[in-house]
C-alpha cells in the first residue's frame, strides 16, 4: 500500500531549493539525499504539483501500483501515512530513474530491449520481469559465494532495466501529443 516506513521520508532539493520548474522535454535532477537502501527494495517518491492540472510524463505500462491523492488535497508529500493516497494507477509518473551510489565492489548489467524487457505481460506488483529474476539469481549466487568463503573478490551486480515499449526509441511514445 501507500504506507511508508516511519522516518524514511526525505525532502528533496534542486540546486539547494525546495522546488523545481521543468520545461517540456527537459530533465531535472535532485540534489543527493542520504537514504540507505537494500538491493530489491521498493522506494516511494512523493511529489506535489501545485496549481493547474498538468499531464504528467509517464510510463503507462509500468506494471506497478502508484498512489495518488484526490485533486485539491494540497501538499501531502511529507505524509508517511497511507491516508491521503486514496487513488491508484498502474503508471509511473514524472520519474525516469532513481540513481543510487553503490559500493566500489559493485557493478551493473544494463538490459536494453523491447517491451518484453520493459515488462509487458508481467504480473502487477510481482516484480517478475526477467531482469528482476536475473537480479535475484545474481544476488543468491553472490550470497552463496560469500557464505562459502569465496566472497572477498565477489562483486554485487545490479541489473538495470532499460527496456522500451511502443517504439519509443524512434518516436515520442504510445500517445504522442498532436
Pin down the residues of each PLM region.
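Catalytic cores of extracellular degradative/oxidative enzymes
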Residues: 114, 120-178
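N-terminal secretory targeting modules
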Residues: 1-112, 117-125, 147, 151
Amino acid at each position: 500500500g501507500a504506507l511508508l516506513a516511519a522516518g524514511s521520508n526525505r525532502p528533496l532539493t534542486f540546486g539547494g531549493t525546495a522546488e523545481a520548474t521543468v520545461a517540456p522535454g527537459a530533465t531535472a535532477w535532485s540534489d543527493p539525499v542520504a537514504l540507505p537502501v537494500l538491493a530489491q527494495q521498493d522506494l516511494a517518491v512523493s511529489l506535489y504539483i501545485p496549481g493547474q492540472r498538468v499531464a504528467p510524463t509517464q510510463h503507462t505500462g509500468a506494471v506497478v501500483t502508484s498512489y495518488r491523492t484526490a485533486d485539491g488535497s494540497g501538499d501531502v508529500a511529507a505524509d508517511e501515512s497511507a491516508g491521503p493516497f486514496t487513488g491508484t494507477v498502474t503508471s509511473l509518473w514524472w520519474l525516469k530513474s532513481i540513481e543510487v551510489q553503490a559500493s566500489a565492489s559493485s557493478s551493473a548489467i544494463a538490459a536494453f530491449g523491447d517491451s518484453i524487457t520493459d515488462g509487458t505481460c508481467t504480473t502487477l506488483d510481482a516484480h517478475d520481469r526477467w531482469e528482476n529474476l536475473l537480479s535475484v539469481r545474481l544476488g543468491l549466487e553472490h550470497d552463496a559465494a560469500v557464505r562459502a568463503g569465496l566472497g572477498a573478490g565477489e562483486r554485487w551486480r545490479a541489473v538495470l532495466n532499460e527496456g522500451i515499449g511502443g517504439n519509443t526509441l524512434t518516436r515520442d511514445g504510445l500517445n504522442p501529443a498532436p
